[in-house]
């Protein structure tokens, strides 16, 4: 039995240093959301050590922490991409809390490819049992929120947004967050497929199709995006795609 457990880059106790967090760095958080991810990691570790570390256990567990995931189908409130898509589809202004905050943006298909690669390798390699892995973009593809907005705006007309970082009271929000994904590259031979601009293009194209097609053909369009992603991975000789 293989189980891939998924938390988030928010699981790390973020002190906003300039280098990416490694899997051995301290977990925690200064806000309830981040702290909840740290607590999930503790719960996972407890079960691994208590129930699945005996020699006769047939369960292998992998732990994953993904960078900021974007992509079609996300409708959560107070998330930068869905908020922009909803507002811009109605020619409305969207409020941006932290335009200069930097995040490890990645398309949702990127960590999914990592989860599947980890699960497949866990089945044949018991040495990976109980290990944690970061899945995110390379360091040079961490971008501020404003750059994300500017890139998304290229695909919309009449884009409007308002910087409320100085005028709005809100909960603690980190200004800088990076992940170090060297371990996934070394152990799993995994690396992201898409460049930043490709990530934004695929994301915005999904939402534009949704609003234009009134949800009638999103299944087929979503499958087409998965196939496009897989073709790109093959053409770029990503190890998980070749296997």
What is the role of each PLM region?
Residues 1-2, 10-69, 74-76:
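Catalytic helix-loop patch of NAD(P)-dependent Rossmann-fold dehydrogenases
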Residues 17-21, 76-80, 111-112, 148-150:
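Short, glycine/charged-enriched secondary-structure capping and boundary segments
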Residues 31, 79, 83, 144, ...:
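Amphipathic alpha-helical recognition patches that constitute DNA-binding helices
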Residues 88-243:
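C-terminal substrate-binding subdomain of Rossmann-fold SDR/epimerase-dehydratase oxidoreductases
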């Amino acid at each position: 039995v293989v189980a891939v457990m998924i938390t988030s880059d928010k699981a790390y106790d973020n002190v906003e240093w300039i280098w990416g967090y490694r899997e051995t760095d301290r977990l925690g958080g200064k806000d309830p959301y981040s702290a909840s991810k740290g607590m999930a990691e503790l719960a996972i570790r407890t079960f691994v050590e208590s129930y699945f570390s005996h020699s006769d256990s047939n369960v292998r567990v992998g732990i994953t922490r993904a960078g900021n995931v974007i992509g079609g189908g996300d409708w959560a409130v107070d998330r930068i991409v869905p908020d922009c898509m909803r507002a811009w589809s109605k020619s409305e202004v969207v409020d941006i809390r932290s335009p200069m905050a930097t995040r490890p943006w990645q398309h949702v298909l990127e960590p999914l490819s990592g989860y599947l690669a980890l699960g497949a390798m866990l089945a044949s390699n018991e040495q990976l049992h109980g290990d944690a892995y970061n899945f995110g973009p390379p360091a040079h593809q961490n971008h501020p929120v404003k750059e994300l907005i500017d890139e998304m705006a290229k695909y919309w007309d009449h884009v409007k947004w308002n910087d409320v970082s100085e005028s709005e009271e809100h909960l603690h929000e980190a200004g800088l967050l990076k992940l170090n994904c060297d371990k996934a590259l070394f152990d799993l031979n995994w690396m992201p497929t898409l460049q930043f601009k490709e990530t934004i293009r695929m994301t915005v194209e999904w939402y534009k199709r949704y609003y234009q097609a009134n949800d009638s053909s999103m299944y087929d369009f979503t499958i087409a995006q998965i196939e496009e992603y897989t073709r790109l991975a093959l053409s770029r000789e990503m190890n998980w795609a070749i296997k």
